């Protein structure tokens, strides 16, 4: 009920493909779209080089090795689950983009040598978060990027999940409607066959929600709420060896722990702290 009220009262509409892939304003400008309900506006005078979201999450920026050298990548398993007709797939670099024998998407870039630059980056690198105004060389301008806290798309997912618990068919209809109206180019998405139960439907909805809000800090809370497992270790994984962590149910490291330095100075905190999750999940080694 309240998700639908938020959709109607906000007057917001989901991002279009053009807005999503905009090389100058993609996920960095509240004024360039009608999807953001709530966000953070960061003026240039508040930007301190590396101390901003863009420096770490924008692969196209030229001033921060955290972004353009470390390169935040999507899990290959998650990427491979994205429908080929889904334009959100263009948020990450396809492993086949350099193969002349295979058809590849013409990725948009704020860099003059965009295609050549993208070919140098690791497979699955994200290009979702662009430097503000496309200013990839100037951290004062490019780093002054707005950041979304809440997009109207989240309300559509909340509504579909809630409705499915009352009427599974209605939840399926709502997810199909969202995907075909706003994400799948040409339509044709149908989750009916993979939604024989509320649990199966929720798994599919969460898959689409993970794709939708990748890097925005939204889905971890859903996965904790639903006690969902993580899978980073598998044949063909692109996760670094020490990060190939598989869990049964919610990950213990999703609970924030106050650091040792603080507990040493304030012993009372140690009695009220969350358990230290260090080494509770061993990396998968094949």
Where are these regions (language model features)?
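Short, cationic low-complexity segments
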Residues: 58-76
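Acidic/polar-rich alpha-helix caps and helix-coil junctions
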Residues: 1-54, 79-286
């Amino acid at each position: 009920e309240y998700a639908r009220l938020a959709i109607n009262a906000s007057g917001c509409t989901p991002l279009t493909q053009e807005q999503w892939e905009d090389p100058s304003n993609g996920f960095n400008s509240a004024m360039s779209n009608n999807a953001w309900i709530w966000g953070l506006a960061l003026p240039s005078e508040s930007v301190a080089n590396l101390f901003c979201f863009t420096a770490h999450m924008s692969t196209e920026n030229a001033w921060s090795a955290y972004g353009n050298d470390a390169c935040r990548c999507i899990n290959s398993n998650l990427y491979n689950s994205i429908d080929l007709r889904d334009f959100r797939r263009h948020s990450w670099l396809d492993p086949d983009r350099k193969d002349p024998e295979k058809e590849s998407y013409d990725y948009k870039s704020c860099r003059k040598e965009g295609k050549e630059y993208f070919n140098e980056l690791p497979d699955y690198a994200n290009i979702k978060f662009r430097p503000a105004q496309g200013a990839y060389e100037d951290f004062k301008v490019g780093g002054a990027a707005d950041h979304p806290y809440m997009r109207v798309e989240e309300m559509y997912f909340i509504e579909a999940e809630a409705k499915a618990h009352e009427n599974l068919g209605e939840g399926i209809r709502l997810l199909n409607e969202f995907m075909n109206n706003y994400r799948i180019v040409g339509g044709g998405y149908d989750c009916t066959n993979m939604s024989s139960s509320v649990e199966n439907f929720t798994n599919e909805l969460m898959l689409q929600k993970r794709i939708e809000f990748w890097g925005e800090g939204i889905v971890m809370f859903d996965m904790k709420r639903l006690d969902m497992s993580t899978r980073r270790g598998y044949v063909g994984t692109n996760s670094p060896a020490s990060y190939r962590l598989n869990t049964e149910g919610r990950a213990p490291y999703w609970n924030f722990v106050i650091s040792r330095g603080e507990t040493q100075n304030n012993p009372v905190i140690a009695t009220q702290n969350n358990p230290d999750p260090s080494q509770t999940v061993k990396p998968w080694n094949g």
